Amino acid sequence: MPEPDSAREDCDAQCASCSGERVIRAAQLLSAPFRAPLILGARALAPVRADVRRSVRRSLGVPPEPPQRAERAGDPFLPPGGMARRVHGDLPSMVVGGLAALLLQTLHPLAMAGVADHSNYREDPIGRLRRTANFVGATTFGTVEQATQAIESVREVHQHVRGRAPDGRRYAASDPELLTWVHVAEVSSFLAAAERYGPSRIRPDERDRYFQETAVVARSLGARWVPETMDEVEAYFKRIRPELHDGPQAIEARKFLLRGVARSPSDRVVYVGIVAAALAIVPRWARDEMGIPAPPLMDNIMVVPFARAFCGALRWTLRP
């Protein structure tokens, strides 16, 4: 759920004036691997790759270097060798999965009302991504203390996010059912992106382990009845689908997400590719509700190969 203005002042003051430029710069940097001269040796490319790696992470709203991972027994919030770290540790697929999650989340009228009433995503389009990335980093790779602090901060913010949706129903970010929706939409998209565009195959039992590990975070935020297996996730979506539908607020937010803020033709091409990759992993029933065609042949022949190549190039660039 979004954060109210009072809770975002320190963060937003640092980036509100240049958010559009940062997103454009990110698009330029993301396409850099395709433009790098292949004739250069690995040693000659190393300094360039290190600079691009730091710049890409800053432009995406995450720290210039990956977070320090808590490894000592009893210290990490989530298991060091677990599936959450494996999925969340692959930034290229997480970028695609994050966009897919935002698109999917627009279909819940109460969640969307909270975004429309309390978020400044139009003025600071990268702000929510940055805050989400910091939260995911702290809860996935941080210590118990770091994760607990991040969770308590979010819970405090949620206490102030409440209101009434256009249909007259009241909403609150602390509502356990809304928290479950946001969580399931998010982690299912992260996993779908990892399976489609990630560096390695994920087994069925590993899917369940991923949902079990991330459910700990959701319950810590106040969510209830959190799915812990792929079967439970699919059953959850089947149960909640009657509550999901499109509306003016959802359409406005989705248009913003699909359009982006890229200016130059090359930047737009890159962003269109990311959008196409994200839409390819949005469930078909959700795309039908959004009125966005889901041609599997085009996805399989054009979108998926491009996205895999793109993620592979970015993964090479970001490798320490």
Predicted regions and their residues:
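Mature, function-bearing regions of proteins
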Residues: P2-W181, A185-P320
